[in-house]
């Protein structure tokens, strides 16, 4: 039958409600809408239903039947409807009250296990809509003499195919809306560039539906080939069908009486709700409310809320500032809007200052946790396990003798410990460090810088394994040294100490070489935070790495160092001086001590014979006063210092000189870094 494009055929409300297509109803409702299915459990909140009309309507009228604030119900029927005036979709539910179900779960404290199963089955499964497109109207789409521009792919998917062999391909389309009303449009393919347009009949549809720019129109082609048409408004209009049960005192009395009758007689009562708006907050899935009751909230707890829309999901966060009932006299024990909140984005006026527990999601505990962003650099660093970060311990007291790679933690750059470390030695900032005792009854005393030295015990025993450094490629036992970090100051290992040292080939050498236990497979003691010992250089010339500056001072003090390992394989050092027994010399700024105190309280002393000179060993003798600074194998400071250094003899000098000793890359000690200071003033670190 022919249809006048300027008129539409009206049908009765009952017929329109019966003719609502489920696919079209869900398409108009939107993707974020869940409809309870038949047989599912939900909780009806009469207090929220009465307040849906606004204006403090949650107060029950005089003479109303007494009903609890939470009514557990079973869904026995679902009817899809649409408002004839606004095309807003809503549902009419048939419910049967089952109050004992909720009370039983409250007493038992259960329902948590079944909540996960009910979550997936309570919502009605949405039908698949493969042939559908939705477009937001523009100003040209809603103009009086304009048409509706359809994307090409959407037109080819939803509309019947056009005959492109003709000069001006066109056809007539008939679409049915939610109320069963048929609308006729002329579909044409024209323009430059060519496009699909709906021309005749479109203006009548826009005027009749009162569409404006920003509203959305959707077309859907079902499995039967029928073309359907729906509207989704940007701003929802008031649906009188939803507020009819609560817009007067008489209607409120009727709805409360029907709920009370259902609680007593298991009768059916009906309610209407809009799944797209907040008016449906008086219908809560049973599992959601029970889950919120099993997880109580507290003041100061942080939360977040996710709002689902057609375009995107919005998230908001806030803080619970109080817990109180809205109306404890008329609705005692009600959990509806019982949480007073303070939003993070307080400038947004759309947020309410009260929310329900089932509307929010908890985030952490009552104290807000600030998450730090990791550094952008993916270079990892190693640090020692948590514990005493300032004071190293021997023989398993904090740090084991042999530490594998599984005991190290990886940490991103910028997340290192704040403690001061230099080549594996941990420096303490605490002035008072107590004495410690190892499992083998050996006492250790710590000075103000946190270094541990043996106080008493059996003499140290040298192992058979002797390490001779042969170049930069050797990495056994050495900590990683980056370019620009080759030089560092050596802090005093004890108070009132004097050192003895001798030079060999312009190098300050120790008496013994570094010993390493053959049974120990871990790192050296220096990498575990224990005192650094001196290494013995071989008579052959040690090659300097190409990217590392090596400084040699012939005017350095003469030291004599005895190195060894304890019974656990831990490396320790014993320093001796040629004049230790005759005079006492202190470090600057420290307290003087007698040699006896040093011997009894700090460590055991040992004297060793002086190493042979260069002439005795058969090696060529170089100028003693010459300083060498090499870069890529070439000397840079050959003439920086005077050549008259032959008057220097080997002997004991005081460790408390004006300039502190300098620790070279492989542990050699120098006390006169004049050439180093002159060179560093001209060139920055990291060259």
UniProtKB/Swiss-Prot annotation:
Induction of the gene: Down-regulated by auxin under light condition.
Listed Gene3D superfamilies: 2.30.30.1040, DNA-binding pseudobarrel domain
DNA-binding region: 133-235
Keyword terms, alphabetized: Auxin signaling pathway, DNA-binding, Nucleus, Transcription, Transcription regulation
Xref: Pfam families: ARF_AD, B3
Subcellular location: Nucleus
Tissue: Expressed in roots, culms, leaves and young panicles.
Signal peptide feature range: none
One GO biological process term: auxin-activated signaling pathway
Subunit structure: Homo and heterodimers.
Family that this chain belongs to: Belongs to the ARF family.
Function: Auxin response factors (ARFs) are transcriptional factors that bind specifically to the DNA sequence 5'-TGTCTC-3' found in the auxin-responsive promoter elements (AuxREs).
Name of the featured protein: Auxin response factor 14
Gene designation per UniProt: ARF14
